[in-house]
UniProtKB/Swiss-Prot annotation:
Entry keyword set: Methyltransferase, S-adenosyl-L-methionine, Transferase
SUPFAM superfamilies: S-adenosyl-L-methionine-dependent methyltransferases (SSF53335)
EC number(s) recorded for this UniProt protein: 2.1.1.-
Molecular function terms from GO: methyltransferase activity
Keyword Transferase: yes
Source organism of the structure: Mycobacterium marinum (strain ATCC BAA-535 / M)
UniProt protein name: Putative S-adenosyl-L-methionine-dependent methyltransferase MMAR_4850
Positions of S-adenosyl-L-methionine binding: 127, 156-157
Record Gene3D superfamilies: Vaccinia Virus protein VP39 (3.40.50.150)
GO biological process: methylation
Length: 301
């Protein structure tokens, strides 16, 4: 389904289904056969959403497929790299004394329940009302308890989320730690710039920010990726990122942030694999995404 300016979704449709996909990949990385991360909530959340292919994935019912290149172990390693990057970001930020955390487009992220937060930490989760409600109720049914003070901000990021965040108690005069995981490709250029401008306006000196970005979204229309997607669709993986992401010219996010006083450090997906002791796959599909860039930044102004 091609995006529209005011489209909406839940966790089984459009952009929302990508949150379920990511949670399924986290569940795979947390599965005892790999045990690369600790996330006991990913699998039950995915099962509760009920998308067949992702339920089968977390249940171990989709084996290696040579023709499509699907390999559960490879998927687990890639998601472990991403998850560890954001986990470590929050651990380091809160150990430095930051006590308010904002998870933008939180989806099925369960960090408010699974990380060992210092006493007094407040975690704000920002996402669509339907997404926030589903996760909150499902985790309550599972008997899960937050390990920090969790405050939900049920708002579309295309609306005035900054006002909603402050109404929930966020203090812009206190340093904060922000994540925009798996978000930027789903925003048009002007919305991406506005997102970072809002983050900067709400951030005190010493605040931290983590995100990843795709340097060129044309990769989703690359012939190698299109062929891979067609083969994966036969296994039931039907999400077509080419329809969900926004293409075209974008501001260079690192340069944009630097102008506002953010000092950044970045690593490519290939570099993160090496840092985590994994070999980056040597094939055409992996090559398309080797330059996805993971960035952490500190506001110095």
């Amino acid at each position: 389904m091609v995006r529209t300016d005011r489209d909406r979704w839940d966790l089984a449709t459009s952009v929302g289904a990508t949150a379920t996909m990511v949670a399924a990949q986290r569940a795979l990385a947390a599965d005892p056969q790999y045990a690369l991360i600790d996330d006991p909530y990913a699998a039950p959340l995915v099962r509760a959403v009920g998308i067949d292919v992702y339920t089968r994935l977390v249940n171990g019912q989709i084996p290696v497929d040579v023709e499509s290149g699907f390999d559960p172990a490879r998927m687990a390693e890639a998601m472990a790299c991403r998850t560890r990057f954001y986990d470590q970001f929050f651990v380091e930020a809160t150990r430095s004394g930051i006590s308010q955390v904002v998870i933008l487009a939180s989806g099925l992220d369960a960090r408010a329940y699974r990380l060992d937060w210092p006493a007094g930490t407040v975690v704000y989760e920002v996402d669509m009302p339907e997404v926030i409600e589903f996760k909150t109720l499902t985790l309550a049914d599972l008997g899960a308890e937050p390990t920090a003070e969790r405050r939900t901000v049920a708002v579309d990021l295309r609306d005035d989320w900054a006002a909603a965040l402050q109404a929930a108690g966020f203090d812009k005069d206190v340093p904060s730690a922000w994540s925009a995981e798996g978000l930027l490709v789903y925003l048009p250029d002007d919305a991406q710039d506005a997102l970072f401008d809002n983050i900067t306006a709400l951030s005190a000196t010493g605040s931290r920010l983590a995100f990843e970005f795709v340097p060129d979204t044309a990769v989703f229309n690359d012939e190698r990726w299109r062929s891979h997607h067609a083969r994966m669709s036969e296994l039931g993986f039907e999400i077509d990122f080419n329809d969900l992401v926004y293409h075209g010219q974008r501001s260079h996010v690192i340069d944009h942030l630097a102008r506002d006083g953010w000092q950044s450090a970045s690593h490519t997906a290939k570099e993160l694999h090496a840092a985590n002791g994994f070999d980056y796959p040597d094939d055409d599909i992996a090559a398309v995404f080797a330059d996805i860039t993971y960035t952490s930044a500190v506001l110095g102004r």
